[in-house]
């Protein structure tokens, strides 16, 4: 007979209507990676790594060691319209790490490095979450403090499967136990199922859901480390379209249903225990499991309910407690059981606490008793969890192990190679064997250009530093600087002009299509018009505001059909425009050549960023604010650091340096001109104001001289008169509903003119008229001239 234990949610705690778990103290940080591969005998690259992570303006060094808890044959089972699909090749199994924080021996860190850093940093009594900042240009991450304000979150209750009384107690004390053997490594293989509601709650994205499950398993592993138990995630099943069993009822009822389904459908999938994760807003129980039944196939299962307003850290504790129950570990008596940390894992109040958690001595004795008396043979087989690279082979063209170079076979290397094909080390006298700054086996001198500008207005040419054969990182000017006569902005080192791009793809005369064409093609959300694919390989609709930020649509200027090898062409006749786009039939892993690039103009004052049409003023303002630190003698680059004008040097371009120049002088002039448009306008305005004043002043001086001469002559010729030529200029503009007419006339006469002069121009007078008339469907322009 077995007893069913349930994890009961406290009414005044986790399931209260107010949020209980909160993420606070949001920080944007840039972790700095430190290479520390100290294990030279290991065949696994980057087995040990370290990061410097700023928290609250203080730097912490995190030391990590690679952990393997994903099986090499790890599979994801996903459902789409009733049919099941499997995925495995896209899952990375060697980017999960655990470790601690330097100077804090009781700390615990669990991180994934697959795509940025994602995981939890736990100090003694406080925890921080970290994850990559989406759409960030640099290695920026969001760091936040995990905070829980609830009390009495959860307690365990038990239900007997039969109505017979049971002797055992839910709590155990630290009494003397019989001698048990030392612990030895055990491997618990899990098959986890995520129901439809939790799949949707986590975003309906298979990759996001997978990462969350992996993070939960990683946190559980960090807690089971002291027992030498590795929780191996052997497979993951996502009920993405519908639940395969009813999820209505209490946790114990759901467990019975899940066991029946498990026995029918999971026989061929290797696992020691199967778990069903279900989302419920406010469940009465948080889980159900049969204690002490780990290696009994009929009962090796559990159901864990994910309630509203809970963190992954807290849910990982719930899963850990349930796994511990299956391994015969009882719930602690807080009065009698102690652990090295402030809160023990099997403590009734552990879910409401933050920071590092460990098993108590009571849990250790209970676990030792279980493996000694009951046995855990099913956990003794070690699954393959790391794909070890083969031993280095010199001459295969791949850099492996301790090889300095590997150019391939003797024929492939050739006599001019800098690498010895026999030993895979550099030849005598050689300083390098490849790289943009390596020529004739020698490192090029400092200042030699190794990477020219990709765009003359938005990129920076990189030079060799004289010590490395590599060219160094590709640095561009900061996003937001104006380019192409202030029509566009620089973004990622380029000035994206959709008209020019259309012309390069579809030929001369092609232009970016009007919005109506984008609306016609992009609204279909198919292979011709979309904003990419989601994790389920479905096309994403752009949304009305973002239609131009999906795939490029152009006008087609000729009647000759456009031919694209290995591509399908679609035309759309919208109003008076012929629109065109192409699907290149490329693999999903290859970027779409017609995807609209970041920084492309999508509306007046707006540009595309990550397939969203956003205001460009924010990007421009960011560039302006950054460049203010350059003291007016430089602009910012993509690292938010100053590149200085000739004669000034970093970091703030304040100090003069004779002969120092980051940019060529002619380039820096144009850059500064674009970066300081306000300065240019100020000079122009000053010039326009000063010019009339100068003219008037000159005229007054000349007039005074002329008057002196006139009075002098008047004494001699009192009856003489002086006449001057006069001129009249008129500009007239007249508009109506049908069109507009603009006329400019100029008259010059040999005789003096006055305000009362009413004479009209004759044959010697000239007039020019320009007439423009436009209608809804056509336009006519006429220019006439008469003499």
Swiss-Prot record:
GO terms for cellular component: cell surface; plasma membrane. Residues 771-787 have a biased composition (Low complexity). It is found in: Membrane. Residues 1-16 form the signal peptide. The keyword Chaperone does not apply. Residues 715-787 are annotated as: Disordered. Residues 17-174 form a propeptide. PROSITE patterns: ADAM_MEPRO (PS50215), DISINTEGRIN_1 (PS00427), DISINTEGRIN_2 (PS50214), EGF_2 (PS01186), EGF_3 (PS50026). One of its GO terms (molecular function) is metalloendopeptidase activity. Residues 175-682 are extracellular. Residues 728-749 have a biased composition (Polar residues). Keywords: Disulfide bond, EGF-like domain, Glycoprotein, Membrane, Phosphoprotein, Signal, Transmembrane, Transmembrane helix. Glycans are attached at residues 39, 125, 465, 598. The modification Phosphoserine is found at residue 17. Residues 391-479 form the Disintegrin domain. May play a role in sperm development and fertilization This is a non-catalytic metalloprotease-like protein. This is Disintegrin and metalloproteinase domain-containing protein 32. It comes from Homo sapiens (Human). The lineage of its organism: Eukaryota, Metazoa, Chordata, Craniata, Vertebrata. The gene is ADAM32.
């Amino acid at each position: 007979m077995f007893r069913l234990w349930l994890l009961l949610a406290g009414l005044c705690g986790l399931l209260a209507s107010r949020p209980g778990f909160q993420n606070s103290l949001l920080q944007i940080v840039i972790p700095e990676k430190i290479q520390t591969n100290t294990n030279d005998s290991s065949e696994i690259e980057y087995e040990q790594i370290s990061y410097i992570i700023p928290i609250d303006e203080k730097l912490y060094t995190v030391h990590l060691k690679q952990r393997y808890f994903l099986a090499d044959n790890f599979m994801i089972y996903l459902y789409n319209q009733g049919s099941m699909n499997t995925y495995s090749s896209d899952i990375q199994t060697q980017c999960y790490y655990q470790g601690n924080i330097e100077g804090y021996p009781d700390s615990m860190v669990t991180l994934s490095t697959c795509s940025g850093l994602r995981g939890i940093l736990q100090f003694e009594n406080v925890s921080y979450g970290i994850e990559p900042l989406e759409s960030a240009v640099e290695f920026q991450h969001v760091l936040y403090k995990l905070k829980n304000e609830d009390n009495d979150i959860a307690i365990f209750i038990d239900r007997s499967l039969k109505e017979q009384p049971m002797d055992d107690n839910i709590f155990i004390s630290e009494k003397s136990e019989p001698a048990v053997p030392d612990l030895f490594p055990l491997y618990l293989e899990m098959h986890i199922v995520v129901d439809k509601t939790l799949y949707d709650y986590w975003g309906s994205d298979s990759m996001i859901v997978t990462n969350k499950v992996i993070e939960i398993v990683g946190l559980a592993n960090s807690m089971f480390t002291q027992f030498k138990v590795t929780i191996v995630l052997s497979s993951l099943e996502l009920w993405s379209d519908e639940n395969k069993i009813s999820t209505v009822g209490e946790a114990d009822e759901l467990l019975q249903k899940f066991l029946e389904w498990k026995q029918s459908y999971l026989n061929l999938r290797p696992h020691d225990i199967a778990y069903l994760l279900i989302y419920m807003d406010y469940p009465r129980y948080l889980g159900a499991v049969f204690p002490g039944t780990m290696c009994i196939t009929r009962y090796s299962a559990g159901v864990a309910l994910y309630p509203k307003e809970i963190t992954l850290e807290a849910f990982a504790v719930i899963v850990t407690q349930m796994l511990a129950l299956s391994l015969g570990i009882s719930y602690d008596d807080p009065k009698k059981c102690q652990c090295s940390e402030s809160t023990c894992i099997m403590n009734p109040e552990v879910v409401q606490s933050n920071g590092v958690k460990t098993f108590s001595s009571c849990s250790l004795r209970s676990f030792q008793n279980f493996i000694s008396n009951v046995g855990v043979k099913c956990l003794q087989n070690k699954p393959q969890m790391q794909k070890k690279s083969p031993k280095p082979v010199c001459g295969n063209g791949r850099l492996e192990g301790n090889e300095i170079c590997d150019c391939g076979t003797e024929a492939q290397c050739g006599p001019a190679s800098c690498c010895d094909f026999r030993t895979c080390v550099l030849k005598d006298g050689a300083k390098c064997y490849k790289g943009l700054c390596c020529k004739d086996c020698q490192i090029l001198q400092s200042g030699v250009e190794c990477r020219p500008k990709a765009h003359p207005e938005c990129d920076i040419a990189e030079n060799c530093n004289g010590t490395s054969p590599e060219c160094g990182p590709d640095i561009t000017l900061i996003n937001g600087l104006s380019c192409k006569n202030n029509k566009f902005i620089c973004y990622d080192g380029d000035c994206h002009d959709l008209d020019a791009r259309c012309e390069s793809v579809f030929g001369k005369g092609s232009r970016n299509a009007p919005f109506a064409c984008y609306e016609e093609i992009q609204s279909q959300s198919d292979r011709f018009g979309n904003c990419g694919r989601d994790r389920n390989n479905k096309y994403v609709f752009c949304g009305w505001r973002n239609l131009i930020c999906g795939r490029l649509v152009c006008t087609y200027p000729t009647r000759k059909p456009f031919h694209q090898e290995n591509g399908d062409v679609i035309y759309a006749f919208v109003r008076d425009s012929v629109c065109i786009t192409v699907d290149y039939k490329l693999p999903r892993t290859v970027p779409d050549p017609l995807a609209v690039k970041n920084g492309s103009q999508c509306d007046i004052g707006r540009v595309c960023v990550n397939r969203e049409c956003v205001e460009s003023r924010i990007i421009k303002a960011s560039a302006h604010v950054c460049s203010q630190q350059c003291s007016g003698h430089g602009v910012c680059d993509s690292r938010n650091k100053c590149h200085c004008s000739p004669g000034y040097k970093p970091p703030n371009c304040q100090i003069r340096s004779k002969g120092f120049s980051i940019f060529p002088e002619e380039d820096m002039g144009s850059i500064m001109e674009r970066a300081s448009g306000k300065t240019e306008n100020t000079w122009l305005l000053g010039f326009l104001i000063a010019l009339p004043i100068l003219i008037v002043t000159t005229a007054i001086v000349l007039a005074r001289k002329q008057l002196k001469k006139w009075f002098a002559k008047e004494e001699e010729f009192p009856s003489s008169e002086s006449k001057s030529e006069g001129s009249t200029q008129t500009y007239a503009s007249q508009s109506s509903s049908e069109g507009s007419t603009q006329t400019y006339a100029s008259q010059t006469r040999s005789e003096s003119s006055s305000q009362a002069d009413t004479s009209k121009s004759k044959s010697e007078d000239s007039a020019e008229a320009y007439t423009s008339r436009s209608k809804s469907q056509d336009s006519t322009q006429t220019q006439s001239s008469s003499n």
